[in-house]
UniProtKB/Swiss-Prot annotation:
GO terms for cellular component: cytosol. GO terms for molecular function: nucleotide binding. It comes from Hahella chejuensis (strain KCTC 2396). This is Nucleotide-binding protein HCH_04620. Belongs to the YajQ family. The keyword Nucleotide-binding applies. InterPro entries: DUF520 (IPR007551), UPF0234-like_C (IPR035571), UPF0234_N (IPR035570), YajQ-like_sf (IPR036183). The lineage of its organism: Bacteria, Pseudomonadati, Pseudomonadota, Gammaproteobacteria, Oceanospirillales. PANTHER family: UPF0234 PROTEIN YAJQ. It comes from the Bacteria. Nucleotide-binding protein. Keywords: Nucleotide-binding. The keyword Nucleotide-binding applies.
């Protein structure tokens, strides 16, 4: 029986390249001359540091641009937390990786509500979709891609006939 997996993974290499490119762009921009501002990437977050609040907004635009150029889904950036320390303002964005249980249940619910001839099962941090025909699986992929209420980056992999 044909099947595929729905996962939420981050391409770490492209994410690292995006953050490096954003740092290079910061050095080149005229409005950031003489300003201590930087992007740092850790295992679970992307951190921005600048001197003013409005500079963080500009930095977010730079980061979003570099992420989209590298074809990294912008939804990988989760909730932000702000900190003020001395003359610097820091904003940290958590990285979303893996499907949470609630999101996985929503995916299964949407598949079942659509009354397609496929079965969905949750397997850890991924959802496996199985069906009798390849066309049914492709229809399920189109349904999930078109759904705006699911606010997670999804990849469809491990497609088997």
């Amino acid at each position: 029986m044909p099947s595929f997996d729905i996962v939420s993974e981050i391409d770490r290499h492209e994410l690292t390249n995006s953050v490096d490119q954003a740092n290079r762009e910061l050095e080149m921009r005229y409005d950031f001359r003489g300003v201590e501002a930087s992007f740092t990437l850790s295992e679970k977050s992307v951190e921005m540091a600048a001197e003013q609040e409005f500079q963080l907004e500009q930095m977010l635009l730079i980061l979003n641009t570099t992420l989209s150029k590298r074809k990294v889904d912008l939804r990988v950036l989760g909730d932000s937390t702000d900190q003020k320390s001395g003359k610097q303002v820091k904003r940290s964005y958590a990285l979303k990786e893996g499907l949470e249980q609630k999101v996985a249940k929503d995916i299964v619910k949407k598949i079942k509500e659509s009354k397609m001839k496929v079965q969905a099962s949750i397997q850890g941090d991924q959802v496996r979709i199985t069906g009798k025909k390849r066309d049914d699986l492709q229809e399920a992929i189109q349904l999930l891609r078109g759904d705006e209420s699911l606010d997670v980056p999804m990849q469809f992999n491990n497609f088997r006939d």
